[in-house]
Amino acid sequence: MAITSKYSNKQIEQMLTEMVDVLDKHRAPADLSLMLVGNIATNVLNQEVPAEQRKIIAEKFAQALLSSLDIPKTH
């Protein structure tokens, strides 16, 4: 999602693979996977981000998510 990151691609890919492996292990369908990822994002925001910054960080996160989607263009 991020264009630039202080984290290496290797670190990100390794953690992402491990998280996807857990979802695959439990045969989580798309709706459950999205619910879990959403709950993780909510927990991180509530526990790790100062209250006065949560809304703006959540909005930036939502914008980054939308911009990273593969959405077919319709004419």
UniProtKB/Swiss-Prot annotation:
A family per Pfam: DUF1414
Top-level division of the source organism's lineage: Bacteria
InterPro entries named among the record's database cross-references: UPF0352, YejL_sf
Disulfide pattern: none
Family per similarity comment: Belongs to the UPF0352 family.
Protein name, UniProt field: UPF0352 protein VSAL_I1058
Lineage: Bacteria, Pseudomonadati, Pseudomonadota, Gammaproteobacteria, Vibrionales
